Each structure stands twice: as C-alpha cells, then as structure tokens.
Amino acid sequence: MRCFKATIAYDGAYFLGYAKQPNKLGVQDKIESALNALGIKSVVVAAGRTDKGVHANNQVLSFYAQKHWNAAKLFYYLAPKLAPHVVLKKLEEKNFHARFDAQKRAYRYLLTKNLKTPFLAPYIACGDYGSLDALNTALKQFTGKHDFSMFKKEGGATTNPKRAIFNAFAYKTFIIGHECVVFKIIGDAFLRSSVRLIVQACVQYSLEKITLAEIQAQIHNIKATIRTPIMANGLYLHRVYY
C-alpha cells in the first residue's frame, strides 16, 4: 500500500462538518465514498476536524491506496468525483500522518458589518465587531499555552485541553466589495469550536459587553462568560504546517 497526502478545499455550507455522519453528509463521507468507487478502501485522516458550516482552504489528508495507483493517475480519477463542493488541489505520495505530524494550524475568520448580497451569506459572517484596536487587545490575551477547557464545546474528544496559540491578530481588508475584519489565529491544535469561542469573546469585548478581566478569568478556568460560539459560516481552516 502507498500513503498519499491530499490537499483539499471544501465548501462547508454543503456538509455537516468534516467528520463522518450517520446520514453520510460529512466531508470525510464524501472523500471515502469517492475512494471506494475507485476500489480504494481506506480511512481518511484529516489534519483537523471542522464543524458544520466551517470551510477549508487547505485541509490536509492522509490515506492509503494500492500500489498500482500513483499520484498523477489517482488525481485524474479522484478529483472529478469530489467536485464541485470539494476541490482536490494537490496529491502526492508521502509517508506521513495528517493529524499527528501537523505542527501548526492556521484559521481565518471573516466578518463584515454589512452584507450587501445574500449569495455571500454562507461564506462571510455578518455583525458588528466594534473597533479593530479592541479586537487586537483581546486577541493578545490568548497567545501562549493555556488550558482551553472553558473555550470548547461539549463533545470534543480530548484528554489534554492544553493548547498553544502562537499568533492571533485581526486586520481589515476588502473581500468582493465588502469591508471585512479578518481574524487570523495560529496554534498547534484547537479544541472543538475553540476558535469560534475565542472570536466571540473578542467581539463581545470590542462591543463593551464583557471585560478583559472576564476573558482572562475564562482563560484561567475561573468562570465562563462566553458559552456560545460565533456563527460558523465565517470560519476557514486556512493552512496546516508540517
């Protein structure tokens, strides 16, 4: 058997998350079904599991296929079976593990105050976010290594809630005619819905609905003020570092 590394992008609006679902509407279901159609029976491992509605620009996968498959041939037959909501960007032979070998993961969150067309609603979150300076002040609180037990949704399977965030900042840019604030958060790994809870905390601070002290209390597992993640549609798994 040969191990393959695949880099994919997908539209999270069409799936119930990355992980396999009973109704077969997970991204993993789509990929494994496409591989099965080619006679390849393999569990597909992803660098990170995204929730329902969350997108990926460069999700990385690892899986095994029979030795008669090479990267060029498999790409040719697999890519059309994944389109249009999953795009196979790159495929190469590589002996590695997509999740365990990943060193860093980068997420981006897109937020605009005024969405001018409904056609972008699944891809850019809409809502007030206050000031850019306040957002960056809040984001700085999260850098470093912390126990993120109070920044995760229930159901995330993990025995170690400690994670390191290497960089977290926000900036403004224009995306398809919309002024957006983009949150960029890079860490070694993330707990379930952790990024969305972090962004929500920063937005609520910027809107003067919570204080920095409340954010710090939640980071240190003293008291949880933010319990509901910000909407999923603005979040993208942007890059995985190896």
Swiss-Prot record:
InterPro entries for this protein: PsdUridine_synth_cat_dom_sf, PsdUridine_synth_TruA, PsdUridine_synth_TruA_a/b_dom, PsdUridine_synth_TruA_C, TruA/RsuA/RluB/E/F_N
Pfam families (UniProt xref): PseudoU_synth_1 (PF01416)
UniProt keyword tRNA processing present: yes
Gene Ontology BP terms: tRNA pseudouridine synthesis
Catalytic residues in the record: 51
Catalyzed reactions: uridine(38/39/40) in tRNA = pseudouridine(38/39/40) in tRNA
EC main group: isomerase
Cited function: Formation of pseudouridine at positions 38, 39 and 40 in the anticodon stem and loop of transfer RNAs.
Assembly, per entry: Homodimer.
UniProt protein name: tRNA pseudouridine synthase A
Originating organism: Helicobacter pylori (strain Shi470)
